[in-house]
Amino acid sequence: MNQEIFDKIKNIIVDQLDVDADSVSPESNFISDLDADSLDTVELVMAFEEEFDIDIPDDVAEKITTVGEAVNIIAEKTGAN
């Protein structure tokens, strides 16, 4: 897992969802662990796209359920595998 991407995503999640940084791990599920709702997840994906200057298609975004999945997709899109 790309630590730099994880750290950036973690900061975005902490800011957007107002959660404790210690509660965010690669295994964290956005909805069940971080109490995000569907609007929160859309806003997070938009923030990820802006931060990393990438486009995440809706069909891919809908499949992102954990922080680790988001890191992997962003790493793939940015070529930072």
Curated annotation (Swiss-Prot):
Record has Lipid biosynthesis as a keyword: yes
Please report the stretch or stretches of sequence annotated as the Carrier domain. 3-78
Biological processes annotated in GO = lipid A biosynthetic process
Record's keyword annotation contains Phosphoprotein: yes
Residues with PTM O-(pantetheine 4'-phosphoryl)serine: 38
User: What is the first-listed, main subcellular location in coarse terms?
Assistant: cytoplasm
* Subcellular localization(s) per the UniProt record: Cytoplasm
Modification after translation, per record: 4'-phosphopantetheine is transferred from CoA to a specific serine of apo-ACP by AcpS. This modification is essential for activity because fatty acids are bound in thioester linkage to the sulfhydryl of the prosthetic group.
Cite the PROSITE patterns for this sequence: CARRIER
An example of a GO molecular function for this protein is: acyl carrier activity
Query: What are the disulfide bonds?
Result: none
What Gene3D superfamilies has UniProt attached to this entry?
A: ACP-like (1.10.1200.10)
Which keywords does UniProt give here? Cytoplasm, Fatty acid biosynthesis, Fatty acid metabolism, Lipid biosynthesis, Lipid metabolism, Phosphopantetheine, Phosphoprotein
* Pathway per the UniProt entry: Lipid metabolism; fatty acid biosynthesis
Q: Which domain of life is it from?
A: Bacteria
Identify one Gene Ontology CC term for this UniProt entry.
membrane
What is stated as this protein's family in its record? Belongs to the acyl carrier protein (ACP) family.
Its annotated function is as follows: Carrier of the growing fatty acid chain in fatty acid biosynthesis.
UniProt protein name = Acyl carrier protein
Source organism per entry reads Picosynechococcus sp. (strain ATCC 27264 / PCC 7002 / PR-6) (Agmenellum quadruplicatum)
What gene is this protein a product of?
acpP
